[in-house]
Amino acid sequence: MEMRRSVPVMAIVVVVVLALAALRSREVSAASRPNPHDDFHTADRCVACHNGLKTPQGENISIGLQWRASVMANSSRDPYWQASIRRESIDHPDASVDAQDECSTCHMPAQHLIDKAEGKKTEVFARFPLLKKHERDAFAEDGVNCSVCHQIERKGLGTPQTFNGNVEVAGAGNQNHREEYGPFLPDTGHKAVMQSSTKGFVPQQAIHIRDSALCGSCHTLITTVRGPGGKAMGQFPEQMPYQEWQHSDYNKKQSCQSCHMPQVAEAVPITALYGPNRVGMHRHVFIGGNFLLQGMLNEHREELDVAAQPEELQEAVNRTSEFLRTQSAKVELLDLRKTADGLSFVVKAQNLTGHKLPTAYPSRRAWLHITVKDSAGRTVFESGALNPDGSIVGNDNDADPLKFEPYYSEITSPDQVEIFEPILGDSQGHVTTGLLSAVRYLKDDRILPAGFDKASAEPDIAVVGGAHDDPQFAGGSTQIRYVIRGGQGGPYQIKAELWYQPIGFRWAHNLEPYKAAEPQRFLSYYEADSRKTAIVLAEAQGTF
């Protein structure tokens, strides 16, 4: 009897021991499993060594300070981006989760890649406002940060495989060795210090960090068109500056980085800790076209939880504005002549950039403001004046959201305005500013870069509308004739200005019906700053 009772007792002991061993094995496995949060660092870790940098002339070129005032650093804080995602989620509630995840790819890249590694989609709204409620939000708030860009692998860059931010990062899941790519060959000492101080991040020289294809990964944005029930209905080429650059003369002579990250002329160190002088360092200012956003970040820095200091943001606004005024466009007056009943002249608008002008986000527009005054200083003709609310006098789209201003090869009336812009159309052919509703361009007459052949351009970057058939609208520039009738009392003073606005009136005011916090907040910002929403890129004057 005693022996028969001992068998089940032993069996129970064996089962318990095996169960404990299995549990212990799972605990060890979970503890040793790589944590996706370790694949990146927030920018403050990098700033510790890459600050306190100056040129021999005393210019502060500290990488961290320049970066944190840039649009890249504040990509997730951008109030217009937040408002736009909310608008799309209201328009397409069944696709809201997918839209948030898709948009976070480039606006919250570190957080997106962490979530992706954990098998989750990034929920943008779960992280608004960005107030560092817990450690996990630090990556969401960090925008396009150092460790994301410098860990992007070369594989697939410049191909559809990596567009929309679908890049691979170096060393993902490797706790002891994650490569951080840079343009310079690291010395042994700094390499060892960085690896130990960052717990596994290793600097590695790689030429692709200066390749335009790296920028093209996020600056090629093809959105998913959404229909009823959030159903995917196709794709739409929302932003294509990389392809525009490829189709221009600039792809042979200038990279994205050479313009948007201006090179330091002198040899300078890139780290404050005994760094050797490096020739060819690029400033991390990421100059672009959105002075309006940088101004809003400064004015509302507390509400938006902006890390950059007021003077840094103001410097960024000034730098962006100066860049636009000096390096983006040129205007000329040609063929001035008197006619039997007035006068005529040609305005030539030249694009000095390596992509369309304006480019990227379709809220951007440029236009010609023309004034003609007689000898007494009276205005006898004006087209394209800017209203105090940010709208353009005579622009059909600003007056009526269902209409838009066509392209003109010749302007004869003050209510005709030459506006260089993209106009989006939905599946019904109606004008829209809804990114997930857009299926095609109804108009795209943004000024082409030099060397851009509109006849051979791919459909995604094609010229659309009347400009397509105008021989004067060509690579590098366009020419528009103005014919003014009834003018008397010359000589006449003619002034031609090319204006630019990062967020057009219609794109801002189409948010009015959306009563959620983010759209209403941005609209209040825009209305308060409406007189500062546009600047003059170039101008020309003439008398005859």
Regions found by a protein language model. Name each.
Residues 105, 109-116, 126:
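Conserved, well-structured interaction surfaces
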Residues 2-12:
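Bacterial N-terminal signal peptides that target proteins for export
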Residues 27-57:
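N-terminal module-boundary/linker segments of secreted carbohydrate-active enzymes
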Residues 489-491:
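Extracellular Ig-like/FN3 beta-sandwich strand-entry sites
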Residues 53-90, 120-462, 468-474, 480-486, ...:
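Primarily the internal scaffold of c-type cytochrome electron-transfer domains
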Residues 11-21:
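Bacterial N-terminal signal peptides
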Residues 36-39, 43-44, 96, 100, ...:
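Residues immediately within or flanking Cys/His clusters that coordinate Zn2+
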